[in-house]
Regions:
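Thiamine diphosphate
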Residues: 1-177, 180-358
Length: 358
């Protein structure tokens, strides 16, 4: 009697949002097949397809051998024969096991056929957490380096459903990254939560998560939530943060980012990929070129350190946390506002580290 009313938001998880978009297409497009390791028996590595085996026949939802090369290459053959496929690699770390198939076949056959061949393939790849060196790497930047692929990385249930719908409508190959840490996240940004109805989120459109006037923080994937936590602390020091969620890496929404940077004059990019060779560096370089006159400071990036991912007990020292964002913002953008030694952490010789590839 004394409790408050439950929220009216439809609070389904990111996992369930993916499932809604996929089952919509599977039930309507008989040419669409879905497969990967344990996709039928277990619903996939992380349960996105759970319950699908009661609806979708075994010839359209099935288990594959433990061979990433076979998973990708058979999808390519099926697609160029007129089919459509959504395939799952259990961890993005295993992209290397299908290197030629992704880099030289999936990405290139449309161009090599002068547009005669379509490759309507969605490659789902999860970014691991808590599983150490070989199962916890963010390889988004590796894929953005390959021309011919669309790359998306949703951080919210609403975007996961909408971007998956767009991916399954595309005739181009799409790599769809998913963070294992976000599978159980519910929607907190969209009024009324994730719609029951079908909808699409377009590629190449970022979204503003928070408006501010002092600094722009661009987030890629799961780093959105660390940035949101940092923004709460920053406002206590009169630093008003604008947060933009990239959502789509290829194509990328430079218009929204540049409009924000022209207002704030400062840019920090946060990604969980290692900093060396990160796509965040490409974005920072382009912003320096396109908005040079508007910048009050050089764009900065925060990523994972340039070394091997540690085990679960050390993971918070590896992927960027809100404290790392605060340290950099106070140290490099607002040194006059730092307090309690915030911004003085990591008193290293950064030039020496760069020379050593660290």
């Amino acid at each position: 009697e004394e409790g408050s009313l439950l929220s009216g938001m439809r609070a389904i998880t990111l996992r369930d949002s993916l499932a809604e978009a996929i089952i919509y297409h599977l039930s309507r497009d008989k040419s669409l097949i879905a497969y990967g390791e344990e996709c039928r028996d277990w619903g996939g590595a992380f349960g996105v397809y759970r319950g699908f085996s009661d609806i979708i026949p075994i010839n359209r939802l099935f288990n594959s051998p433990i061979s990433e090369a076979a998973i990708v290459s058979t999808a390519i053959g099926y697609a160029i024969s007129g089919g459509r496929a959504i395939i799952e690699l259990m961890y993005s770390d295993f992209i290397g096991r299908a290197g030629d198939e992704i880099f030289n076949q999936l990405a290139k056959w449309q161009a090599m056929s002068a547009g005669e061949l379509n490759l309507p393939i969605v490659l789902r790849a999860s970014i691991g957490s808590k599983y150490g060196a070989q199962h916890s790497q963010d390889w988004t930047s590796l894929l953005t380096h390959i021309p011919g692929l669309s790359i998306v990385y949703p951080a919210t249930p609403y975007d996961a459903k909408g971007l998956m719908a767009s991916s399954l409508c595309s005739n181009d190959p799409t790599v769809f990254f998913e963070s294992q840490r976000l599978y159980d996240k519910v929607e907190i940004f969209t009024e009324n939560g994730v719609p029951k109805n079908y909808y699409k989120v377009p590629f190449g459109k970022a979204v503003k998560r928070r408006s501010g006037k002092d600094i722009t923080i661009l987030t890629i994937g799961a780093s959105l939530y660390a940035a949101l936590d940092a923004s709460i602390e920053l406002i206590n020091h009169n630093i008003d943060t604008e947060i933009i969620d990239a959502r789509s890496l290829v194509p990328f929404d430079y218009e929204m980012l540049l409009n924000s940077v022209k207002l704030t004059g400062r840019l920090l990019i946060v990604s969980e990929a290692v900093e060396r060779g990160s796509f965040a560096n490409t974005i920072a370089t382009n912003v320096s070129k396109f908005a040079f006159k508007n910048l009050k400071a050089s764009p900065m990036i925060i990523g994972a350190p340039n070394w091997i991912a540690p085990g679960a007990d050390m993971e918070k020292t590896y992927s960027p946390q809100s404290e790392d964002i605060l340290d950099l913002v106070f140290r490099d953008f607002f040194p006059e506002k730092r307090i309690n030694k915030r911004g003085l952490r990591k008193d290293w010789d950064f030039l020496d580290l760069a020379k050593k590839g660290l």
